[in-house]
């Protein structure tokens, strides 16, 4: 059963990361979708598997699937993560409202949890530094503390 679960996870994550419609319109949504999928999978594992050993085996399959899928094109995954964080760390020009500090911390923690699996950390750093400097120079940063 674990093998089928692992296969399903890999296929579903690969589909999320290669969805042409999402990639063409809003690439940052790819990471949002991956984070939602990860959360839903973790909740499912917690509800279904009450024994620690089973729970741990299926969580391991999820981690392996994330690592495999995010590194199929790790440069692209790292870029999308930087764009996703940039979107949340900017002031919203349309509504002029900021995300609450708690929401922002949750987003950052979620991205960090997935970032561990990406091998191209240097690519992420490059894109993040570029967007950080742009936010700071244009004074579009939502909060200095989060930066």
Regions found by a protein language model. Name each.
Residues 1-147:
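Eukaryotic scaffold/interaction segments
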């Amino acid at each position: 059963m674990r093998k089928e679960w692992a296969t399903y996870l890999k296929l579903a994550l690969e589909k999320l990361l290669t969805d042409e419609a999402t990639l063409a319109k809003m690439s940052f949504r790819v990471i949002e979708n991956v984070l939602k999928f990860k959360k839903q999978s973790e909740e499912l594992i917690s509800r279904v598997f009450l024994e620690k050993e089973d729970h741990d085996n299926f969580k391991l399959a999820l981690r392996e699937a994330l690592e495999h899928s995010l590194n199929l094109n790790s440069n692209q995954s790292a870029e999308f993560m930087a764009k996703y964080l940039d979107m949340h760390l900017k002031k919203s020009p349309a509504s002029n409202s900021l995300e609450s500090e708690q929401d922002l911390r949750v987003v950052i923690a979620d991205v960090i949890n997935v970032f561990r699996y990406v091998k191209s950390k240097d690519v992420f750093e490059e894109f993040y530094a570029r967007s950080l400097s742009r936010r700071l120079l244009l004074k579009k940063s939502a909060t200095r503390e989060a930066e």
